[in-house]
């Protein structure tokens, strides 16, 4: 069983990664808004705005794709650690009942659950990249159009309009998901929910699978102060997984296990452990009642822990909002004095709140990533633009050979990953430097094709060309490489790779 405190710490590393990405994206938007040429006809503005928005979208995709490898590694490690922690406590219960749970590594069912949980959450993050690019680009278009209208119609002077636009973007934060209702989640909110939900659901399914192996039906649900009211109704109880018990309520029907709003759903920190008749219960009625008591007081107002935590989150959002504004205005070369003063004010408000309630600060919830000076922001924006142009399409030399974006032939043991950058063309050496392998990546940054100048030391398996030169087509299915069939090079491939053949 995972404790709520464990789950609250789980997303810290991922949030730190994405907080910096969010700040980079917001600063880039602010710089573009500040440098835009507003004194142009409306028709020209529409075309130019779409061009700017397209570049913003590509920059967002490029920035978030740089996190893909680190995100995948972090998620896999989090899943394995959380699964180990959850099953360790459960297995101790089973052993006390005279049962003998096998190691996780020896259970094919548990390994499948672990892999499925990782793949589902990794897929959520891949989708997050696309939805963020779409949502944030829409934000940028609206902001730029609003500034244009304010300036050209005379509603505001140039500086006031730019400042107002950047302030509004900073208030909203970089949108990651936009719902049909109009509500938008920021990157920080989306990342936290994805990690907590993904890790907890995977751990719970591992516990479920283990309970099936052990033939266990009853579970005790965890309880904690600060639970949302709908979850407080069923936390701490004993339930029947099968729903067949006459003594204990149905686990799924009562807790909503398996649904977004139920146990193990969106941002839920509840868990469960196996329970057998004769075991003592962890939570009695008095303790559960105490969890719902109004034990906190702030400025004379009595609060439950849930209400106190909601107020703490509100204050943290205020700190993040002004930090974002300070960094964005500085990147755009505008005065950020008001934002700096507001940060001081909200930090003071947070200290007062924590002193009155006794709650602890959570640094990850007020972090927004490191800001840039105007010159640094301009330099970074220029570098990003060059990076985007470099990987915007395949490019060719005058003699018809393809342009190599990444020459890694001087690197020792370079790792050519399955996913890299869109339209990348990477050269590496193999066979002790005797063979060149050229990897092409597609528009989504996934391996597409490899051209090799030799037979990989195995001419029987690669009986192609004069010297074993050949191509491998990379076949993908369900997000994985499933095959790499070899074939002869086409005439066009020979032409564009003539510089290595």
Mark where each language-model region is.
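N-terminal leader/targeting and assembly helices and adjacent pre-domain segments
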Residues: 1-164, 287-413, 448
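Intrinsically disordered, low-complexity boundary segments flanking structured domains
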Residues: 101, 105, 111-112, 203-210, ...
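Contiguous, non-catalytic segments that form substrate-binding/exosite surfaces or channel walls
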Residues: 123-214
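Acidic, glycine-rich two-metal-ion catalytic cores of nucleic acid-processing enzymes
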Residues: 185-288
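Intrinsically disordered, low-complexity acidic/polar segments
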Residues: 279-280, 328, 480
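Short intrinsically disordered coil segments
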Residues: 284-293, 486-491
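Catalytic toxin/effector domains delivered as secreted proteins or via bacterial secretion systems
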Residues: 325, 395-501
């Amino acid at each position: 069983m995972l404790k709520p405190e464990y789950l609250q710490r789980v997303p810290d590393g991922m949030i730190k990664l994405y907080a910096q990405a969010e700040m980079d994206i917001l600063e880039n938007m602010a710089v573009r808004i500040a440098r835009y040429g507003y004194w142009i006809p409306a028709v020209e503005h529409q075309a130019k705005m779409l061009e700017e928005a397209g570049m913003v979208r590509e920059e967002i995709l490029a920035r978030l794709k740089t996190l893909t490898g680190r995100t995948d590694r972090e998620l896999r490690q989090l899943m394995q650690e959380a699964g180990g922690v959850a099953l360790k406590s459960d297995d101790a219960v089973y052993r006390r009942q005279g049962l003998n749970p096998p190691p996780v590594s020896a259970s094919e069912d548990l390994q499948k659950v672990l892999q499925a949980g990782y793949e589902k959450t990794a897929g959520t993050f891949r989708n997050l990249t696309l939805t963020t690019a779409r949502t944030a680009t829409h934000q940028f278009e609206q902001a730029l159009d609003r500034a244009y209208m304010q300036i050209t119609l005379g509603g505001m002077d140039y500086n006031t309009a730019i400042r107002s636009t950047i302030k509004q973007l900073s208030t909203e934060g970089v949108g990651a998901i936009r719902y049909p209702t109009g509500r938008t989640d920021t990157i920080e909110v989306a990342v936290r929910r994805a990690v907590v939900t993904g890790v907890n659901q995977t751990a719970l399914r591992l516990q479920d699978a283990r309970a099936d192996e052990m033939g266990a039906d009853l579970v005790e649900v965890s309880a904690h102060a600060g639970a949302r009211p709908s979850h407080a109704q069923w936390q701490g109880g004993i339930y029947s997984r099968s729903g067949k018990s006459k003594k204990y309520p149905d686990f799924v029907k009562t807790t909503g296990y398996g649904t977004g709003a139920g146990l193990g759903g969106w941002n839920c920190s509840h868990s469960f452990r196996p329970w057998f008749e004769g075991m003592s219960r962890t939570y009695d009625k008095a303790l559960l009642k105490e969890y719902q008591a109004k034990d906190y007081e702030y400025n004379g107002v009595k609060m439950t822990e849930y209400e106190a935590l909601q107020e703490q989150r509100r204050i943290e959002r205020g700190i993040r909002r002004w930090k974002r504004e300070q960094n964005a205005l500085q990147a755009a070369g505008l005065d950020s004095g008001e934002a700096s003063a507001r940060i001081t004010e909200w930090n003071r408000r947070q200290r007062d709140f924590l002193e009155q309630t006794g709650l602890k600060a959570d640094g990850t919830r007020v972090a927004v990533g490191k800001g840039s000076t105007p010159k640094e922001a301009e330099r970074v924006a220029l570098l990003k633009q060059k990076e985007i142009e470099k990987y915007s399409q395949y490019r060719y030399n005058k003699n018809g050979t393809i342009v190599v974006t990444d020459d890694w032939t001087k690197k020792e043991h370079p790792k050519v990953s399955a996913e890299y950058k869109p339209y990348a063309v990477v050269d590496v050496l193999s066979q002790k430097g005797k063979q060149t392998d050229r990897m092409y990546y597609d528009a989504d940054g996934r391996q597409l094709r490899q051209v090799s100048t030799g037979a990989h030391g195995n001419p029987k398996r690669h009986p192609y060309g004069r010297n074993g030169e050949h191509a491998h087509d990379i076949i993908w299915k369900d997000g994985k490489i499933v095959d790499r069939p070899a074939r002869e090079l086409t005439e066009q491939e020979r032409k564009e790779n003539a510089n290595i053949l």
